[in-house]
UniProtKB/Swiss-Prot annotation:
Protein name: Cobalt-precorrin-5B C(1)-methyltransferase
Source species of the chain: Clostridium kluyveri (strain ATCC 8527 / DSM 555 / NBRC 12016 / NCIMB 10680 / K1)
Catalytic activity field: Co-precorrin-5B + S-adenosyl-L-methionine = Co-precorrin-6A + S-adenosyl-L-homocysteine
Gene: cbiD
InterPro entries found in the cross-reference section: CbiD, CbiD_sf
Keyword Transferase found: yes
Entries under NCBIfam families matching the protein: cbiD
Length: 365
């Protein structure tokens, strides 16, 4: 078991290793056994993070002119769907010094704007470098090898990853910039947001729909929106907006639950509850500014959830959602120094759409 830990929120979490590290290890082991006839149970590789990994070779298959090796992906305490899958590498003797190919279960890139060009197999640049570097360490002088990376369960697993959204079909991607998986890595989540936005731009979109998660996607689909132009930004609102500006996006529509959106109204651009939780304060403040009875303001302020708060707010104060919506719009446009035009659709689970600011915003500009 890989023995590297981090402290996250007071918890000791075990790190893991990427699909790129698995592929590099499997390829190195297969290439070494192809020419040395050794029987290996472990193989060592170095990672871009300068952490040496000693990985177990789970399975080996040999033929007259090839060797196949398997390494099991261990993501540590990171809740990734690729954890536990088999990453295989096949090494075959070749007249050419080094060739990398992809087989079953490795995705093919069908869109623009990613790290790998359209039409190529989805093994990212850093893993490609790692695989070649490690294979060359064990390749005898004057000998050549063709390495094929494949993942038997890749096509099935890929349906649960971001690949379908990124227009990568047929399998998973071989990923990793450091070789090490850091549990609950904020940088990894941000990178997926950045990639998805750049991919949408490369596909020709000038305006995007930003969503917090699957519920927002369901709501957008329910409203008949073009999901192809949507990006799930998770809690990283500010980061997503910066990426939109960087990619010269002209307009964004945020579709979200009032519990998330109300935080933006208060100027919070990371909506994780540990970073910012002013949902009910925002609603109570708006009610007070509208002249609502003190009992209603206090009841909303003391509520446990925004869903509960919505039930308390009477028809008399339904304009609260429009007020919050305009504040969200202004916060976003101020945050991006006017580079983005913002529109907002706010909903809750019990009452549905609370405010659809699209036509209203257009009328007021």
């Amino acid at each position: 078991m890989f023995d590297l830990y981090i402290n996250c929120g007071g918890k000791k979490l075990r790190c893991g290793y990427t699909t790129g590290s698995c592929a590099a290890a499997a390829a190195k082991a297969a290439a070494k056994m192809l020419y040395s006839q050794e029987n290996l149970e472990h193989i060592s590789i170095n990672t871009p993070k300068n952490v040496e990994l000693d990985l177990h070779i789970e399975s080996v298959k040999k033929g007259s002119d090839y060797v196949e090796c398997c390494v099991i992906k261990d993501g540590g305490d990171d809740p990734d769907v690729t954890n536990g899958i088999e990453i295989w590498a096949r090494a075959e003797k070749s007249e050419k010094e080094y060739t990398l190919k992809a087989g079953i279960g490795i995705g093919i890139v069908k869109g623009e704007g990613l790290y790998v060009k359209k039409g190529d197999f989805a093994i990212n640049p850093v893993p490609r470098i790692m695989i070649e570097k490690e294979v060359r360490k064990v390749l005898p002088q004057g000998k050549g090898v063709t390495i094929t990376i494949f993942v038997p369960e890749g096509e099935k697993i890929a349906k649960k990853t971001f690949n379908p959204r990124l227009n990568i079909v047929g399998g998973i991607s071989i990923l990793g910039t450091t070789g090490i998986v850091v549990p609950m890595s904020e940088e990894a989540l941000k990178e997926s947001v950045k990639l998805e936005i750049s991919q949408k731009v490369a596909s020709g979109y000038k305006d995007l729909i930003l969503l917090f998660g699957n519920m927002g996607e369901d709501k957008a689909r329910e409203l008949g929106m073009d999901i192809k132009k949507s990006v799930i930004m998770s809690n990283y609102v500010g980061f997503a907006l910066e990426c939109c500006v960087e990619n010269k996006i002209e307009k964004i529509l945020i579709v979200g639950h009032i519990g998330k959106l109300s935080k933006i109204a208060a100027g919070c651009f990371n909506t994780h509850s540990r970073v910012c939780d002013v949902r009910l304060e925002v609603m109570a403040l708006e009610l007070a500014l509208m002249g609502a009875d003190k009992k209603i303001v206090e009841a909303v302020y003391n509520e446990k959830t925004t869903e509960g708060a919505v039930k308390i707010i009477s028809e008399e104060y339904k304009d609260i959602y429009e007020r919050i919506g305009y504040k969200i719009k202004k916060r976003i446009e101020d945050f991006t120094y006017g580079a983005l035009k913002a529109e907002v659709i706010m909903y809750c689970m019990a009452s549905g759409i609370l405010w659809d600011g699209r036509s209203k915003i257009d009328e007021n500009n």
